[in-house]
């Protein structure tokens, strides 16, 4: 499960992608990173 995400974090989309295993994967939705 990915860490909580915060839309205020400019690095968040990269963190989401890294957590989800690749570029273009993972979205910051609500407080959670969804893969």
UniProtKB/Swiss-Prot annotation:
Disulfide cysteine pairs (residue numbers): 2-19, 5-28, 16-33, 20-35
Keyword DNA repair attached: no
MF (Gene Ontology): chloride channel regulator activity; toxin activity
Coiled coil: none
Classification via SUPFAM superfamilies: Scorpion toxin-like (SSF57095)
Pfam families: Toxin_5 (PF05294)
Record-linked InterPro entries: Scorpion_toxin-like_sf, Scorpion_toxinS_Cl_inh
Entry keyword set: Chloride channel impairing toxin, Disulfide bond, Ion channel impairing toxin, Knottin, Secreted, Toxin, Voltage-gated chloride channel impairing toxin
One cellular-component annotation, GO: extracellular region
Tissue: Expressed by the venom gland.
Major site of localization recorded for this protein: secreted
Compartments (UniProt record): Secreted
Free-text domain note: The presence of a 'disulfide through disulfide knot' structurally defines this protein as a knottin.
Purpose of the protein: Toxin with unknown function in healthy organisms. On glioma cells, interacts with chloride channels (probably ClC-3/CLCN3) and MMP2 at the surface of glioma cells. This complex is then internalized via caveolae, thus inhibiting the chloride channels necessary for cell shrinkage and tumor propagation.
Recorded family membership: Belongs to the short scorpion toxin superfamily. Chloride channel inhibitor family.
Protein name (Swiss-Prot/TrEMBL): Chlorotoxin-like peptide Bs 8
Organism encoding this protein: Hottentotta tamulus sindicus
Lineage: Eukaryota, Metazoa, Ecdysozoa, Arthropoda, Chelicerata
């Amino acid at each position: 499960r990915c860490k909580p995400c915060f839309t205020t974090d400019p690095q968040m989309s990269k963190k989401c992608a890294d957590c989800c295993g690749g570029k273009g994967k993972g979205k910051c939705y609500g407080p959670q990173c969804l893969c």
